């Protein structure tokens, strides 16, 4: 799993 995916997931979670 690339860090980009993790960053995106984290951003989505933080947004919601």
UniProtKB/Swiss-Prot annotation:
Subcellular location: Secreted
Chain positions found as Phenylalanine amide: 16
UniProt keyword Secreted present: yes
GO cellular component terms attached to this protein's record: extracellular region
One of the protein's GO biological processes: defense response to bacterium
Expression sites by tissue: Expressed by the skin glands.
Main localisation: secreted
Disulfide links within the chain: none
Keyword terms: Amidation, Amphibian defense peptide, Antibiotic, Antimicrobial, Immunity, Innate immunity, Secreted
Family: Belongs to the frog skin active peptide (FSAP) family. Temporin subfamily.
Described purpose of this protein according to its UniProt entry: Antimicrobial peptide.
Protein's recorded name: Temporin-1Tq
Naturally occurring in which organism (per UniProt): Rana temporaria
